[in-house]
Design a protein with these regions (language model features):
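Short, flexible helix-loop junctions that flank or precede catalytic/ligand sites
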Residues: 1-164
């Protein structure tokens, strides 16, 4: 295949149960993913983002400004779950996956649909912050429980938030 987008369009014609998208990083792939979702296909895609809220901004930023609002509405109706994951080195020499996520409930969709899509990311990240489910919150707990070194924790916790 010449691109992720071409592969995605080809996959839709085969009527798969699940479509995996290695990485959504350009307009063509993002558009093909939304179109696949609009036709009822279950798609799982990856993006490099630091928070679930940033994912909306990054995805919508791939679309030209003249269609961004309509793609925001389509995306909001299609996205079910956003997960961000990092691997943290533990004191036993291993790594542990640490995740933050948002489940796109009908209530959350209704709230977001009444706002500008430019505010969605902040709103989502604020929910996660208030619930203390951010990656940095979990890493701090790991550090406080002596599961990771301070130097490892410092990779995920901003200096101003790191306990003395």
């Amino acid at each position: 295949m010449e691109s992720f987008a071409a592969g995605l369009r080809s996959a839709v014609r085969r009527n798969p149960d699940i479509i995996g998208i290695g990485e959504i990083r350009d307009y063509e792939t993002a558009d093909a993913a939304v179109q696949a979702g609009n036709t009822g296909h279950f798609c799982i895609g990856t993006m490099h983002t630091k928070s679930p809220g940033e994912t909306f901004a990054r995805l919508l930023g791939l679309f030209p400004p003249e269609i961004r609002d309509s793609m925001a509405a389509a995306t909001l109706s299609l996205v079910q779950f956003i997960l961000v994951q990092v691997l943290v080195r533990t004191n036993d020499g291993g790594r542990q996956a640490v995740r933050e996520y948002i489940v796109m409930t009908d209530e959350l969709r209704n709230t977001l649909s009444g706002q500008s899509h430019a505010t969605w990311g902040h709103y989502i990240d604020e929910i996660i912050r208030q619930e203390k489910r951010r990656i940095r919150d979990q890493v701090l707990t790991m550090y406080q429980n002596d599961r990771i070194e301070k130097s490892e924790a410092a990779l995920f916790i901003p200096a101003g938030e790191f306990p003395r």
